Amino acid sequence: MSRMAEQQLYIHGGYTSATSGRTFETINPANGNVLATVQAAGREDVDRAVKSAQQGQKIWAAMTAMERSRILRRAVDILRERNDELAKLETLDTGKAYSETSTVDIVTGADVLEYYAGLIPALEGSQIPLRETSFVYTRREPLGVVAGIGAWNYPIQIALWKSAPALAAGNAMIFKPSEVTPLTALKLAEIYSEAGLPDGVFNVLPGGGAETGQYLTEHPGIAKVSFTGGVASGKKVMANSAASSLKEVTMELGGKSPLIVFDDADLDLAADIAMMANFFSSGQVCTNGTRVFVPAKCKAAFEQKILARVERIRAGDVFDPQTNFGPLVSFPHRDNVLRYIAKGKEEGARVLCGGDVLKGDGFDNGAWVAPTVFTDCRDEMTIVREEIFGPVMSLLTYESEDEVIRRANDTDYGLAAGIVTADLNRAHRVMHQLEAGICWINTWGESPAEMPVGGYKHSGIGRENGVMTLQSYTQVKSIQVEMAKFQSIF
């Protein structure tokens, strides 16, 4: 693909040049080619976007629920019509295999938008009788202008996960995509405008987190920030949001999630789940089950089943429909993952497979890392304690149920957890003791629109998807009505 034209900001229904004068490049990680130069939003651009959003939000909130629902459903239709085009762009920007982006990223994002479009008419208040002459009624009103700050691993899906409930509740959103993968969020803005969204209701400001992101979190005109990213960045977002105007926040942060295989589990099923929990999207999924706990007596058999499945991984041309494994999203991220792999070797973990970059024709110019499995891991190892966000699985053994529960919970994270067992009594008993917000029994990874997702502990605050997320983009107004004559004590 030839280099794209310079990408601008999207404010008030159209593209506009940034006033900051700063630009950055977005790179195809499969081959190192520059895809485009992108303009970065500065403080004046954030001010412009907020003013635009304030204007658009008033128009949007004044529409009827059915009018808003129809516009968002029209956007869903356009997303599905343009699925292949958007998936190709997502593959170029992220490096993910087209077999994945064409069936997951836009598809699931559109599902979430459709879900919230259908919920808009159901967003209602309540009536509370006090006595014969008085009652209270409540209204759910939009917050106003909110900000979404996305991560680089699921660019358009995250933009939809954040914008769908916000817009459904009558808000306007200013969205900052990751500077690593900014392209499809701009296309989403085009689609919203084409669907009939009023100008300003969805503005997109590319730029770095330390500049554009900070300006958004500090801006007094923004009522809420929804952030997806790392824990350290999330803490800064929370601090800025609180210091500026006590903004509400939703935080979807990191994870180091446990996948527990019990001794009664079908080991073929468990190995299939472990593969998906570690190597889907080349391991760049926040919910990955990277700490795989296996009964000591099953270790050797499980290792062989994992090795057999690693042989089925097909890395290569990301547009080949048979390819199911792509490069990492960027060269700096590749180097960081390689540092973790080196640390694992240094601390005594045994490399079962992988452990290096992929080499050879088609790989040398890209950010490729081989699918890596470490065994003989211990809980104190760096690769077991810290989020790597790459194709690195750690196998650990255990002896008892109580032991594995304790060790699974021994982490600052609490995003996800999984169990593989034939005993559903055990599954529920153990799951109720695991400290994680997104949990799976005999499966892994699905996050449907109806399912609230979010973490415990350092993995986040608040939830995305589900009814409660729609409500989190509203504020409740309570109104008392008195029909009898008011009696003053004065």
Curated annotation (Swiss-Prot):
Transmembrane segments: none
Note accompanying the cofactor annotation: Binds 2 potassium ions per subunit.
Site (Seems to be a necessary countercharge to the potassium cations) location in chain: 248
Domain of life: Bacteria
GO BP terms: glycine betaine biosynthetic process from choline
Residues that coordinate or bind K(+) 2: 246, 457, 460
Cysteine sulfenic acid (-SOH) PTM positions: 286
UniProt pathway annotation: Amine and polyamine biosynthesis; betaine biosynthesis via choline pathway; betaine from betaine aldehyde: step 1/1
Catalytic activity: betaine aldehyde + NAD(+) + H2O = glycine betaine + NADH + 2 H(+)
Keywords from the UniProt entry: Metal-binding, NAD, NADP, Oxidation, Oxidoreductase, Potassium
Keyword NAD: yes
Transcription is among the record's keywords: no
Cofactor(s) required, per the database record: K(+)
MF annotations from Gene Ontology: betaine-aldehyde dehydrogenase (NAD+) activity; metal ion binding
EC number from the UniProt entry: 1.2.1.8
Function: Involved in the biosynthesis of the osmoprotectant glycine betaine. Catalyzes the irreversible oxidation of betaine aldehyde to the corresponding acid.
Family designation: Belongs to the aldehyde dehydrogenase family.
NCBIfam families: BADH (TIGR01804), PRK13252.1 (NF009725)
Subunit text: Dimer of dimers.
Name of the protein described by the UniProt record: Betaine aldehyde dehydrogenase
Gene that this polypeptide is encoded by: betB
